[in-house]
Amino acid sequence: MRSIWSGILSALLVLGFAAGSWAQNGLERFEKEIKPQFELKKFSYASAEPLGSSGFILNDVVAVVPANPATGDKESTVKIQKVTVEEMDFDRMKKDAKDDETPRFAKLKLEGMTGDDEMFAALQPYGVPNVPVDIALDYRIDPAAKVLTLKTLEVSLRGQAKIVFSLVMDGISDKAGMAGAKDDGKLRTASLTIDDSGLLSKLVPAMAKEQGAKPEEMVQTALVALASFAEGQGPETLKALDAVSSFIADWKAPKGPLTLGLKPAKTAGLSDLDKIMMPNALVTEFGFTASYPGTRAGAAKGGATAAK
């Protein structure tokens, strides 16, 4: 009997040591399975550390993209102050992973991203400085239920504006062949928050100048269009449109973030958009809501006068 238990104990010890040698933290998996796939001229970071069992942190990242048509046939450099990955679907991102399988989840943050590529300077002609960009992403696909939950997609231009988007969609597969998602996907809920702290006051005049118009004229055109849509709408729809109109009218200095929401009575797809012009369908069919701290009652029907 003693020999039997000794054999079992030995086997368990062997398995335990083997499991310990196989176990890898998030940083080790990234450096072994993901990093070698990067087609970059250079990829470095000043320091790195694991984060829990499946995450990692990289500090002062430098990535040099080789010259190619997308970069104007010249090298481009991207720098990121801090990369934080809380979790990532490593199994779907390995080199030998199936091409038709999309990563099922990711939760990460990129803080202080800058670059010398044209993309990072795209807004400079409009008077917007080339400021660091912060990005946060948190999503998960449930393969069995075919549900995509985008908890957060946040893009922030430091000192200029922040946009936060979230949604839940039915009918989304974890297969890469998602071309039919626009037909199969049905929206359950969605939210968009625009927190402007100076971006609109630079973009609107610059865009108006491009069109040979004054900023006020361009804003009034948008408000008149909203006023036209507001005709014949019910109280709940008008309340939401008042928030949107007030935010647009305050483009020089918004009084807080504008938050838009959708929660259809039944899951909605692109084929349902033809209903949007029906009276009150925006609220009754699509569950549209809008909130803005500076909302002025009657702003939607006020049209161009809301900007004065």
Model-identified regions with their sequence ranges:
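Bacterial N-terminal signal peptides
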Residues: 9-16
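Glycine-rich, small/hydroxylated-residue low-complexity segments
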Residues: 17, 21-308
